[in-house]
Amino acid sequence: MSESELGRKWDRCLADAVVKIGTGFGLGIVFSLTFFKRRMWPLAFGSGMGLGMAYSNCQHDFQAPYLLHGKYVKEQEQ
Amino acid sequence: MVARVWSLMRFLIKGSVAGGAVYLVYDQELLGPSDKSQAALQKAGEVVPPAMYQFSQYVCQQTGLQIPQLPAPPKIYFPIRDSWNAGIMMVMSALSVAPSKAREYSKEGWEYVKARTK
């Protein structure tokens, strides 16, 4: 794995971690305010779940160096 | 009767807010693969600052307040990768020459002590 590819993977991992932890935290806030009487545990639970998902994605990304990241391109109807 | 209807309404409102948040997360694929999360973060970085600026302009127009222009944040350039790599190379070269340098300095020290005791 070249250094630039490694750098890109680290960037992707960090961005993924930020998004997932933030999303988990946000969902925790919503559920804490709506159903769980402003308790703290939904926030911790959501953030922890986001962190775990990000760690799992990063681990898979670093352990599978031969997978290519592509994107779907829709066929244009003529 | 009214209390029951009101508690049912409250539950429906809370349920719709929570369900809307869950649907938004599912639709934007925020908890999906890392590519989608990275794309969502990039899109947020492009969309949020102009939206905040437009909102502040709208608030200024409606209230007549003038928000002072903040100075631009200083651009700090610190290449972590280069300094880390340089640090690693320095440590490894120091470790590789450490035995010969130690031998040289101890020999010099011994010669010095010998010369002083004569």
UniProtKB/Swiss-Prot annotation, chain A:
Tree of life domain: Eukaryota
Entry's localization field: Mitochondrion inner membrane
Positions of post-translational N-acetylserine modification: S2
Chief location: mitochondrion
Parts of the chain on the Mitochondrial intermembrane side: 37-78
UniProt-listed GO biological process terms: cristae formation; inner mitochondrial membrane organization
Keyword annotations: Acetylation, Membrane, Mitochondrion, Mitochondrion inner membrane, Transmembrane, Transmembrane helix
Family label: Belongs to the MICOS complex subunit Mic10 family.
Record protein name field: MICOS complex subunit MIC10
Origin organism lineage: Eukaryota, Metazoa, Chordata, Craniata, Vertebrata
